[in-house]
UniProtKB/Swiss-Prot annotation:
GO function terms (MF aspect): L-lactate dehydrogenase activity
Residues annotated as the enzyme's active site: 194
Record's keyword terms, sorted: Cytoplasm, NAD, Oxidoreductase
Gene label: ldhc
EC primary class: oxidoreductase
Protein family according to the UniProt entry: Belongs to the LDH/MDH superfamily. LDH family.
GO annotation, cellular component aspect: cytoplasm
Listed name of the protein: L-lactate dehydrogenase C chain
Catalytic activity: (S)-lactate + NAD(+) = pyruvate + NADH + H(+)
Tissue-wise expression: Eye and liver.
EC id: 1.1.1.27
Amino-acid positions noted as binding NAD(+) in the UniProt annotation, renumbered to this chain: 30-58, 100, 139
Length: 334
């Protein structure tokens, strides 16, 4: 007797279903991982979403919760497992797994603990999706992006750190808020390390083409009577403040990662400050990943914009690179 399925549907295609073309995997289903997953779903960037986590019940519960909302989404397939075979044929893999940053803990203190985790997960990602682009989100993101590049064997343009894309968004929001305009109308960049030694490019801040340094030559310096420099300090401290208030950060970084995913998936050639290999640029001699203005397309980092910086900004960027190298050179087993 024929089933309801066979009575209802007559198949026409003889071949098996095609593999996904725009599959995204999120590794780690903590607060950050799920914020990334949800924002990617809401922005309709994937035809399949895979979730992976070492805690099997947690990852399957998150999968079911999202599947139950499928009616309200445009992603037809959501899968999850602790086995990395579920990630096969991913175009983009977002890595959020790692030890959570604690209140008052500086990002660079997380290094070796998270390196040991990456030694397990990165080879598995590459085994199942050898052509993928990896976006590293786990902190300390610049160090772990370098570690991912070393462990993966992928070309450097396909290993990207979320970097200062979020720092720059925070900077633009805080500066625009003081000016009474929308953050999209303020143009400003933060480069270097995602965190304590990040570099605000005050020389490039502008609104509608009006460079703020021409209005206030001391902007961002210790001699600035308006104390705009405090805005960058607020950017650096903002994650610690949010962690102090709610225990973790997740929504802003999730939105930031979805923004990067869109530029990559849709071949947009948009420019983002993300963590990339900086050796040979701005006098940086060591193999470090830090944020520079990168053109993102379907191949990963297509190119890097040679931003005009002041001598002081270059020195700060070199200092940021030195800070990261001092950590990296002591890492074990990568």
């Amino acid at each position: 007797m024929a089933s309801v399925l066979h009575k209802l549907i007559t198949p026409l295609a003889c071949s098996s279903p095609e593999p996904p073309r725009n599959k995204v995997t999120v590794v780690g289903v903590g607060q950050v991982g799920m914020a990334c997953a949800v924002t990617i779903l809401l922005r309709e960037l994937a035809d399949e979403l895979a979730l992976v986590d070492v805690v099997e019940d947690k990852v399957k519960g998150e999968m079911m919760d999202l599947q139950h909302g499928s009616l309200f989404l445009k992603t037809p397939k959501i899968v999850a497992d602790k086995d990395y075979s579920v990630t096969s044929n991913s175009r983009i893999v977002v890595v959020t797994a790692g030890v959570r940053q604690q209140e008052g803990e500086r990002r660079l203190n997380l290094d070796q603990r998270n390196v040991n985790i990456f030694k397990h997960i990165i080879p598995l990602i590459v085994r199942h999706s050898p052509d993928c682009i990896i976006i590293v989100v786990s902190n300390p993101v610049d160090v772990l992006t370098y570690v991912t590049w070393k462990l993966s064997g992928l070309p450097m343009h396909r290993v990207i750190g979320s970097g200062t894309n979020l720092d720059s968004a925070r900077f633009r929001f805080l500066m625009a808020d003081k000016l009474g305009i929308h953050s999209s109308s303020f143009n400003g960049w933060i480069l270097g390390e995602h965190g304590d030694t990040s570099v605000p490019v005050w020389s490039g801040t502008n609104v509608a083409g009006v460079n703020l340094q021409t209005l206030n030559p001391n902007i961002g310096t210790d001699f600035d009577e308006e104390n705009w420099k405090e805005t960058h300090k607020m950017v650096v401290d903002s994650a610690y403040e949010v962690i102090k208030l709610k225990g973790y950060t997740n929504w802003a970084i999730g939105l930031s990662v979805a923004d990067l995913t869109e530029s990559l998936m849709r071949n947009m050639n948009r420019i983002h400050p993300v963590s990339t290999m900086a050796k040979g640029m701005y006098g940086i001699g060591d193999e470090v990943y830090l944020s520079l203005p990168c053109v993102l397309n379907s191949g990963g980092v297509g190119s890097v914009v040679n931003m005009t910086l002041t001598d002081e900004e270059v020195a700060q960027l070199q200092g940021s690179a030195s800070t990261l190298w001092d950590i990296q050179k002591d890492l074990r087993d990568i």
